[in-house]
A protein has these predicted regions:
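Short beta-strand scaffold segments in enzyme catalytic cores
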Residues: 16-20, 122-126, 131-133, 240-242, ...
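C-terminal nucleotide
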Residues: 144-278
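ATP-binding N-lobe of GHMP and related small-molecule kinases
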Residues: 1-74, 255, 268-273, 278
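Alpha/beta catalytic cores of group-transfer enzymes, especially the acyltransferase/condensing modules
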Residues: 102-147
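Beta-strand segments within the central parallel beta-sheet cores of soluble alpha/beta enzyme folds
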Residues: 63-67, 101-111, 201
């Protein structure tokens, strides 16, 4: 659980909702759906359930049905695998009355995502929400982060072209070397001046250094630069994002709409982190 990452990011209200239905005393079975469609993959969600099965005898001999409603594009740098794992862990704990604390359930989600190679710092970020700086790696309760205040008038504007493989890039020695070489310096500069403007500036500098900017992202970044709007690229997604005053949203929409490919997403910032819904 001490494996993780340092870094920074922002959580969106355009999130993931997970519904869990449990039938006790049945033949052990797990069914997972995404958007009302049954899926055979969902490796991170299956790993979460596997960990629960290993730790709690009461989870065995249960028919578990999981339904993920994912609001953000999958695989495009929005942390959807971490969100699915986290929401599932919280929901399973509640549905089966397992008695874990919120942090303990979140730790299960973190371990599952690390094992599956789909993320290192996503779960802790989504546990607390907001704009966070992860200053010590690890699962929730072990890793440490600093929260940067985000005014309510700010929204996150994104233009999404498609997915990039987190697992592929986290296992690539060259990409990891580039991340590690500059990541610590960028984090130190952000901690020294923990502002939204500095976050966006350093995020862009980091994206340029890592070297994963696609042709579509480059074209849109250039247009945003000409319009004096600071944009960056999330790790890891074929996407462009900016944090902007919602009263000025038309300006960035004009820039995004010049790009024929992709789609635009606007979301407010989630300040509370993952929560159980009534």
């Amino acid at each position: 659980m001490r494996v993780g990452s340092k870094g920074a990011g922002v959580s969106l209200n355009l999130g993931t909702k997970t519904i869990v239905r449990v039938k006790r005393g049945s033949k052990q079975r797990l069914r997972i759906g995404i958007g009302n469609q049954r899926v055979s993959s969902a490796s991170v969600s299956r790993e979460v359930v596997k960990i629960f099965l290993q730790r709690f005898h009461s989870v065995r001999n249960c028919d578990v049905e999981v339904e993920h409603e994912i609001g953000a594009p999958i695989g495009a740098g929005f942390g959807t695998s971490g969100a699915a794992a986290l929401s599932l862990a919280l929901a399973l704990n509640e549905a089966m009355d397992l008695g874990m604390s919120r942090i303990e359930a979140a730790q299960v989600a973190h371990v599952a995502e690390v094992r599956c190679g789909t993320g290192l710092g996503t779960v802790i970020a989504e546990t607390y929400g907001g704009l966070e700086i992860r200053v010590k790696p690890g699962a929730p309760g072990i890793g440490e982060l600093v929260c940067v205040p985000v005014p309510k008038n700010l929204v996150v504007a994104c233009h999404v072209f498609g997915p990039l493989s987190t697992r592929k890039f986290l296992s690539d020695p060259l990409t990891r070397s580039r991340i590690n070489n500059l990541g610590g310096k960028m984090l130190k500069l952000l901690i020294e001046a923990p502002t939204i403007a500095n976050f966006m500036k350093l995020s862009r500098r980091f994206a340029e250094h890592v070297g994963l900017i696609t042709a579509n992202v480059r074209a849109l970044l250039d247009r945003a630069d000409k319009a004096a709007i600071v944009c960056s690229m999330p790790m890891f997604g074929d996407c462009v994002f900016a944090m902007i005053d919602k009263n000025s949203i038309d300006e960035i929409l004009r820039v995004f709409q010049e790009q024929q490919a992709g789609r635009t997403i606007i979301s407010s910032v989630n300040q509370e982190g993952a929560q159980l819904l009534n």
